[in-house]
């Protein structure tokens, strides 16, 4: 850096090359921000598309692989989280952040044209000549041309992204303390004496919104460096103050949920990668207090049949699934699940829903359990709150009943309309165990039909009719089609 001159201007003095190079360094970074934004949006868009495909894969696995219900559901939720992450990344650019990228591009354009103008006003010849508008800070002599390379003025619309930090670039520019006017030379026509060269010119001429100023008497205004002008400069100040946040969002890399056997292997082949599934698995299990496994990695390895560095049993099971999907009009083709494109997966989901509907229509529903009077009373009588009572598909609250123990009553008509199969109850009104589970030990009590709760093996089958189950599954699948 060079010491500041006295607060006096000299008509025709050039811009100091040090200051010019600082402006160019900033401009080179600023003009790449649109490319950086395009890269970020492309990453997020691709992640969202792939994660939607992963959702469809997991939904099909949920229907086709009952032994891997928890694994498929965990990946379905994980894919949903990834879609949400991608959407959040895209939404970063719906307001001020995009405006700031535009400001960076705008400021770069203004700097480039000024620098090309100043550098172009020079005497042709070797270094040492002083007839120039962009000269050495010490002495003002002509310097080698640098604007095209330092400002990168020749780049077109297809400029490459570089992950550069616009906030840091604006800060660096704002720290330049070199006086803008070179200490020698007096031949620049652009910085001539405005007051004498024109019949009248009462005011100074600000450039770049006041980052630089041509004094009314000529030359660049001394004592006003980029450092002193930048804090209030509309071209730069917002990028200096908020550019770091923009840079952080531009650097965001949105990952996608797995859609291939290799991607599943990567996600499940190490403890660090498997840990990414914890939030999704916790959401699926909705653990009761004290029920969550202390060793998540051991749990998730068991769920997927995973081992370090190997394909998981779940991934291999997916490899064994092939489904007929439409191709040309009137024809179908059997495709392996991993090879399916989104259109194929959508057709496979529709076909799977149709299969479930057909199966539900051809199988007679399980006979309803006829409740005794004592059992029906036990289902509802312990509920005291009216809202809770009425929320049950088989209870209704009778506000006129004087006996508080009988206000919540069993409603057989409501139960029939709801389609809910009623649980058997024990002598104390608690849910009874079924014959197939009640005599099993803790080790024998296994899913999918039985579940150990407390000190008893209980029937874990879903207490809903086939029609109700179908509506839930169909709704879940249909939501993935759009």
Curated annotation (Swiss-Prot):
Pfam families: Trypan_glycop, Trypan_glycop_C
Lipidated residue numbers (GPI-anchor amidated aspartate): 459
Annotated Gene Ontology cellular component terms: plasma membrane; side of membrane
Topology of this chain in the membrane: Lipid-anchor; GPI-anchor
Known glycosylation sites: 92, 398, 411
Claim: GTP-binding is one of the keywords in the record: no
Residues spanning the signal sequence: 1-8
Disulfide bonds: 24-151, 133-188
Keyword terms: Cell membrane, Disulfide bond, Glycoprotein, GPI-anchor, Lipoprotein, Membrane, Signal, Trypanosomiasis
Residue stretch(es) of the prosequence: 460-482
Subcellular location field: Cell membrane
Any Gene Ontology biological process: symbiont-mediated evasion of host immune response
Function: VSG forms a coat on the surface of the parasite. The trypanosome evades the immune response of the host by expressing a series of antigenically distinct VSGs from an estimated 1000 VSG genes.
Protein name, as recorded: Variant surface glycoprotein ANTAT 1.1C
Originating organism: Trypanosoma brucei brucei
